[in-house]
């Protein structure tokens, strides 16, 4: 697992483990997003802004807790519901995951290509 820092409310730094190439992490990631999709369907979309914001933030709190471990959302947000901070942390998290997937893919391709003959070399040998 790789250690990363997410920046929560009041610039608090929370160290988390993210490993997009690890099976157990992938399972937690996938299940958490499936649960989030269900929560989003039930999310109140009309009414008081304060209630909408609270529901929105709670949905992401559950996502972070389900992927990164119970209590992570409390560390990140200190029990507060701020939609902009939630969006920033989510963006930071997805950025880390995306960069890791790209890096893992590039490394895997490098390893595979090391043992795969070059297409041009195969053609010239015919």
Description of each model-found segment:
Residues 1-50:
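Short N-terminal mixed-charge amphipathic segments
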Residues 74-126:
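C-terminal charged interaction modules
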Residues 28, 32-35, 59, 63, ...:
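Charge-rich, solvent-exposed alpha-helical interaction surfaces
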Residues 11-13, 35-40, 64, 102, ...:
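Intrinsically disordered, low-complexity interaction/regulatory regions of eukaryotic proteins
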Residues 62-66, 70-79:
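Mid-chain, well-packed structural core segment of small domains
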Residues 42-45, 49-66:
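Negatively charged, Asp/Glu-rich surface segments that serve as flexible interaction/assembly modules
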Residues 35, 39-42, 46, 70, ...:
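Surface-exposed polar/charged interaction patches
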């Amino acid at each position: 697992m790789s250690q990363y820092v997410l920046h929560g409310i009041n610039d608090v730094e929370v160290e988390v483990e993210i490993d997009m190439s690890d099976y157990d992490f992938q399972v937690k990631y996938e299940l958490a997003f499936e649960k989030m999709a269900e929560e989003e369907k039930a999310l109140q979309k009309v009414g008081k802004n304060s209630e909408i914001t609270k529901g929105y933030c709670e949905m992401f709190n559950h996502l972070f807790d389900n992927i990164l471990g119970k209590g992570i959302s409390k560390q990140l947000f200190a029990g507060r519901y701020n939609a902009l901070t939630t969006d920033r942390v989510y963006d930071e998290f997805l950025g880390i995951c995306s960069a890791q997937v790209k890096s893992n893919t590039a490394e895997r391709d490098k390893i595979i290509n090391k043992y795969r003959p070059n297409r041009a070399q195969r053609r010239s040998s015919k």
